[in-house]
């Protein structure tokens, strides 16, 4: 646990009155993780089928059969590594609830700006509200700021009109400036 003074020593931010440092946590770049996993899978002798629209998933003679528009794959085990559009398939529709989360990025910050924020580590930060804000430093000296009021779509439907949401972006920007008024 961090006292208010200890939290302020980590990140100079008026709203922070305490905190918790989780030593065994981390942040990751999802695309880099996916590419790394694919390399490991390929080296192990398994195959990765990307950009494969799945029409059906069924069990046939104790094995799993995946049917695509171009053919079928039978395997003892499969990993369904999907993206947001998994909820558009019938099999996933009632198993997945899409939740939009939004991010914004700052311009690269100067050393003076970083000093004013008192944030010199590369630890990710997350608040503990119902709709969390999360942020981290990027390798090129920006702040990736995300979270806020996500949009939840029941019945598994997503839509391009939700990819950019001006109201939520304005809210993200406002909460960023409240967190870092410097």
Describe the role of every protein-language-model region:
Residues 6-14:
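Flexible hinge/switch segments at interdomain interfaces of large molecular machines
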Residues 14-76:
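Helical element adjacent to the flavin cofactor pocket in flavoenzyme catalytic cores
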Residues 54-56, 61-62, 71-112, 116-182:
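Active-site substrate-recognition segment that forms the wall
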Residues 5-6, 54:
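Residue-level "edge-of-site" marker
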Residues 1-3:
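Dinucleotide-binding Rossmann-like beta1-alpha1 core, especially the glycine-rich loop
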